[in-house]
Curated annotation (Swiss-Prot):
Residues 275-327 are annotated as: Transcriptional activation domain. This is Transcriptional activator Myb. It comes from Gallus gallus (Chicken). The lineage of its organism: Eukaryota, Metazoa, Chordata, Craniata, Vertebrata. It is found in: Nucleus. Keywords: Activator, DNA-binding, Nucleus, Proto-oncogene, Repeat, Transcription, Transcription regulation.
Length: 641
């Protein structure tokens, strides 16, 4: 069974009239004798005269009897020829205001398809006349303005692909009828395109430019199959009839947040990009061989994008805004959108705030677009990229917020004078961490707005770990004990270089091994003391009085003997000897000749630098105590190789 062709909403083709006859078109094809042709051959003058006489003799009750006297004609053809062309009561003159008003009322009552029923209420008019009068003159959706270059480009591209299928081309131009498009092409565009090269250079842009016709459509028209229970808000024109109400919305800026449900095209999406609009037009193409493939793709897109569209709707109670341009694509369902740099941050974890989409009246849709999958079309790659970026960004904010906003005692630090850190502090005041907003109202910090972490719903961060930050505790304790610290000038770097040279030279000396071998029992005591307090010994080694005054030129190490004389300390019996209280022999092991100068003369150390480098700050001492307690928890044991 052949499918019935779909027509444009502005099409002038009559759906109920299968045979179109023309008035006195006697120059057409003539039927061959000897055969009964039932095709759409043109009527001759002789056939028209004979039909008039037969109607005068037999009347208009039985058209089969009349058709029996006309070879090659059926009863339907005879009836249509009489009613549409030859009937003397047929009015072919101009339309009056009363007739136009009557047509408008009947269209609102019966809809823009039942033209035969409408014609019965207008004496002397047939359905074809009423249909053409409505679409060409009375329909408020039909544009009567001049043709734009954009519309010409759409017609040119569509005509290259579809040919003279004006009803299909009319679907790409809302507000233009197929008859108007055909007349514009034949009278103006074809000559300009073929002779003057009009639109030839811009043809490379392709058909996606035709999709702008949907975005610039200034009207919406709808016909509800079932009358609603109450009046719908936002209708520009109230229905005059009760059987088939008609709603007209004049301009898109006057449309409220919720569009009335009985609309002709239910596109149940937040935002339709241009490629999606082009896919809608290709979907309605009967001759498109890839139509079924695209339908399946659209159904898959529905499943993958339904949750994302819900997630893009911003929460109405969200007061915190952030300066992130990457989130500007978030679209609010009620057409309320903030400007520029302050796009609302969508909550990805709560979907119960999302507004459900209005129900779809499938009766208003074409037969192939009744399913919701064909009504929701989005750009797949953009949606998937946005979902991935939003999830990664939310995870990053979760880690940053949990690190900066938590501490062991939840104390409020004085950030006007921050403690000494390894990172230089800016000269002006700024918020280093995100302030708490649990029990106090939100305060706008204009000067620190760029540096603040964006606010996020606490419900997302409930499962995040809340580990105390020892470094923040150390800074707070240091401020309480010593007061706010100030930035000190940088310590000269040559002292550090000298220390590194001395340490390198001392590490290369092998005389210490021989001295340790001669020292005997005191070595075990020194090793034990170094194990118990390594930080204190290191501090005493670098910061003791041996580095000051007259002892600066004293060499601490002696030249080493050969490596063959060095015993193995791990296997030697020296570890088993009792500890001696004598200290003198141990210091002798570090004596070196005095004729060997240092790399450079040492200078007096800065107290602050000495504290930081020798482990005397509060946080370093605290870490040392923790390490000592940790090591003391394990019993001592003999090292076995």
């Amino acid at each position: 069974m052949a499918r019935r062709p779909r027509h444009s909403i502005y099409s002038s083709d009559d759906d109920e009239e299968d045979v179109e006859m023309y008035d006195h078109d006697y120059d057409g094809l003539l039927p061959k004798a000897g055969k009964r042709h039932l095709g759409k051959t043109r009527w001759t003058r002789e056939e028209d005269e004979k039909l008039k006489k037969l109607v005068e003799q037999n009347g208009t009750e039985d058209w089969k009897v009349i058709a029996s006297f006309l070879p090659n004609r059926t009863d339907v053809q005879c009836q249509h020829r009489w009613q549409k062309v030859l009937n003397p009561e047929l009015i072919k003159g101009p339309w009056t205001k009363e007739e136009d008003q009557r047509v408008i009322e009947l269209v609102q009552k019966y809809g823009p398809k039942r033209w035969s029923v409408i014609a019965k209420h207008l004496k002397g008019r047939i359905g074809k006349q009423c249909r053409e009068r409505w679409h060409n003159h009375l329909n408020p959706e039909v544009k009567k303005t001049s043709w734009t270059e954009e519309e010409d480009r759409i017609i040119y591209q569509a005509h290259k692909r579809l040919g003279n299928r004006w009803a299909e081309i009319a679907k790409l131009l809302p507000g233009r009828t197929d008859n108007a498009i055909k007349n514009h092409w034949n009278s103006t565009m074809r000559r300009k395109v073929e002779q003057e090269g009009y639109l030839q250079e811009s043809s490379k842009a392709g058909l996606p430019s035709a999709t702008t016709g949907f975005q610039k459509s200034s009207h919406l028209m709808a016909f509800a199959h079932n009358p609603p229970a109450g009046p719908l808000p936002g209708a520009g024109q109230a229905p005059l009839g009760s059987d088939y109400p008609y709603y007209h919305i004049a301009e898109p800026q006057n449309v409220p947040g919720q569009i009335p449900y009985p609309v002709a095209l239910h596109v149940n999406i937040v935002n339709v990009p241009q490629p999606a609009a082009a896919a809608i037009q290709r979907h309605y193409n009967d001759e498109d061989p890839e139509k079924e493939k695209r339908i399946k793709e659209l159904e898959l897109l529905l499943m993958s994008t339904e949750n994302e569209l819900k997630g893009q709707q911003a929460l109405p109670t969200q007061n915190h805004t952030a300066n992130y341009p990457g989130w500007h694509s978030t679209t609010v369902a009620d057409n309320t959108r903030t400007s520029g740099d302050n796009a609302p941050v969508s909550c990805l974890g709560e979907h119960h705030h999302c507004t459900p989409s209005p129900p779809v009246d499938h009766g208003c849709l074409p037969e192939e677009s009744a399913s919701p999958a064909r009504c929701m079309i989005v750009h797949q790659s953009n949606i998937l990229d946005n979902v991935k970026n939003l999830l990664e960004f939310a995870e990053t904010l979760q880690l940053i917020d949990s690190f900066l906003n938590t501490s062991s005692n939840h104390e409020n630090l004085n950030l006007d004078n921050p403690a000494l850190t390894s990172t230089p502090v800016c000269g002006h005041k700024m918020s280093v961490t995100t302030p708490f907003h649990r029990d106090q109202p939100f305060k706008t910090q204009k000067e620190n707005h760029v540096f603040r972490t964006p606010a996020i719903k606490r419900s997302i961060l409930e499962s995040s770990p809340r580990t105390p930050t020892p470094f923040k505790n150390a800074l707070a304790a240091q401020e309480i004990k010593y007061g706010p610290l100030k930035m000190l000038p940088q310590t000269p770097t040559h002292l550090v270089e000298d220390l590194q040279d001395v340490i390198k030279q001392e590490s290369e000396e092998s005389a210490i091994v021989a001295g340790l071998h001669e020292s005997g029992p005191p070595l075990l005591k020194k090793i034990k003391q170094e194990v118990e307090s390594p930080t204190d010994k290191a501090g005493n080694f670098f910061c003791s009085n041996h580095w000051e005054g007259e002892n600066l030129n004293t060499q601490l190490f002696t030249h080493a003997s050969t490596m063959e004389d060095v015993p193995n300390l791990l296997t030697s019996s020296i570890l088993k000897m009792p500890v001696s209280e004598e200290e003198g022999s141990f210091h002798k092991a570090f004596a070196v000749p005095r004729n060997r100068p240092l790399a450079s003369p040492m200078q007096h150390l800065n107290n602050a630098w000495e504290s930081a480098s020798c482990g005397k700050t509060e946080d370093q001492m605290a870490l040392t105590d923790q390490a000592r307690k940790y090591m003391a928890a394990f019993p001592t044991r003999t090292l076995v190789m």
